[in-house]
Amino acid sequence: MADPKKLYIKTYGCQMNVYDSERMAEAMGGEGYVQTDRAEDADMILLNTCHIREKAAEKVYSELGRFKPLKAEKPDLKIGVAGCVAQAEGAEIMRRQPLVDLVVGPQAYHRLPELTARAATGAKALDTDFPEEDKFDHLAARPKAKRGPTAFLTVQEGCDKFCAFCVVPYTRGAEVSRPAARVLTEARDLVERGVREITLLGQNVNAYHGHARGLAGLIWDLAEIDGLERIRFTTSHPNDMDDALIAAHGACDKLMPYLHLPVQSGSDRILKAMNRKHTAESYIRLIERIRAARPDILLSGDFIVGFPGETDQDFADTMALVEAVGYGQAYSFKYSARPGTPAAEKEDVPGEVADARLQTLQALLTRQQRAIQDAKVGTTARVLFEKPGRLPGQMVGKSEHLHAVHVAAPDAARGDLVRVRIAESSANSLRGVLIAA
């Protein structure tokens, strides 16, 4: 019997890309491929790319360049580029890096097996269409092999908001939601394979409309699945946090008290320039309503500093918003222009100014995060163990609030959900002690 062909996938960027890479690996598994952790051993290399951060495309071209010696050594090696850089760059990738055999966008990866077959004939294979049919209808059933206790599940893709800085509407397309019945089927399958926590994914997940009662309705249906202990969702837009979803945070025990709700800026002038379609005040009022429903919720956010036209006062407004809200986790970045977006045509804030503002903002966010973590010492938490720790007999898992917790638990296993007392806080994690059952 011939040895199976080997597939190496390198994943960049968001959780949705992680999910997409899993599905691509499964699709290629049906073609006889098994995954390998070493590009040197692969018969096919696939880069699943992200286009959000600065110079994303150039980083992909640089990575491809490192495969030139390997391609020369193994002429039958197939190299593909998938994801959002593939969508944005298209055939330009093959022009700049002729070693690339196939390019596939995020809405067409269900066609990966046929593109691979085309590439095997020596032809270049390209598919960056936004197909009419739902790609999920054309993916093979997920394998029944056991897996870890947590999983991502994409329920929504694309975005209709057209923020001035963002490429997502151009690389992922318009908002599309998967029908609730199909999401529930996949969720039940994941639970049967050992999953106890599911994170629902979407570029704008709370705009989900595949259920008659929106994302809240889907969450309540998921909560009925025996064996599914925890539900999370990300990423959300403030304008789509409706009353039903806020109420679910207060009433659904399986919905974890954690919410990633990007705001990007605390300045109304900059929010308008970003085309965010909300104000700082409306965001703060929304946070108050969410906290009224779930007082212990941990909030996470995204911030961009140095957006074109940002003044010292605009930045001060952002700092004031952060002080008012109090974030347990946040992601902050210096603005970098994305080609093809409206903001790319505007004059940038000087780099040294943006750098200084970012440093100031991150210092505040770090203080807030550390204060919230320190306040957990002496409290109890339920921790879902995901993997062994670095120390003998240690397990690592996540609390309800998505904090990493290290626990001495020599008799525990992945997937155990245990009560612990938080004994110590460090910069990026907590240490817990098992509470006897």
Curated annotation (Swiss-Prot):
State its role.
Catalyzes the methylthiolation of N6-(dimethylallyl)adenosine (i(6)A), leading to the formation of 2-methylthio-N6-(dimethylallyl)adenosine (ms(2)i(6)A) at position 37 in tRNAs that read codons beginning with uridine.
Q: Which gene encodes it?
A: miaB
Q: What is this protein called?
A: tRNA-2-methylthio-N(6)-dimethylallyladenosine synthase
User: If you read the UniProt record, what top EC class would you report for this enzyme, in one word?
Assistant: transferase
Superkingdom of this protein's organism: Bacteria
PANTHER family, sorted: CDK5 REGULATORY SUBUNIT-ASSOCIATED PROTEIN 1, MITOCHONDRIAL TRNA METHYLTHIOTRANSFERASE CDK5RAP1
What EC numbers are recorded for this enzyme? 2.8.4.3
**Where does the record place the TRAM domain?**
374-436
Q: Cofactor binding mode, per the note?
A: Binds 2 [4Fe-4S] clusters. One cluster is coordinated with 3 cysteines and an exchangeable S-adenosyl-L-methionine.
Record-listed [4Fe-4S] cluster 2 binding positions: C159, C163, C166
Q: Indicate the segments forming the Radical SAM core domain, all copies.
A: 145-371
